[in-house]
């Protein structure tokens, strides 16, 4: 099983709060090994966003990296 599918399968069984906790834990720990998992989550969300949501997300990203 590839990493992308493994991450998505694991997250499907989790609640919104559990996923939020996972994201916060990765951010707080600065564990670079978990970065691919965040990328999978981002890609899954991005693929389902409208153009308006993508524009809004890009504003948040730009604010975060500036």
UniProtKB/Swiss-Prot annotation:
Keyword Transit peptide assigned: no
Induction: Expressed only in the forespore compartment of sporulating cells.
Chief location bin: other
Pfam families listed in its UniProt record: SSPI
The entry's keywords: Sporulation
GO biological process: asexual sporulation; sporulation resulting in formation of a cellular spore
Keyword Magnesium: no
InterPro entries: SspI (IPR017525)
Localisation per UniProt entry: Spore core
NCBIfam families: SASP_sspI
Family stated for the protein in its record: Belongs to the SspI family.
Protein name: Small, acid-soluble spore protein I
The organism of origin for this protein: Caldanaerobacter subterraneus subsp. tengcongensis (strain DSM 15242 / JCM 11007 / NBRC 100824 / MB4)
Gene (UniProt): sspI
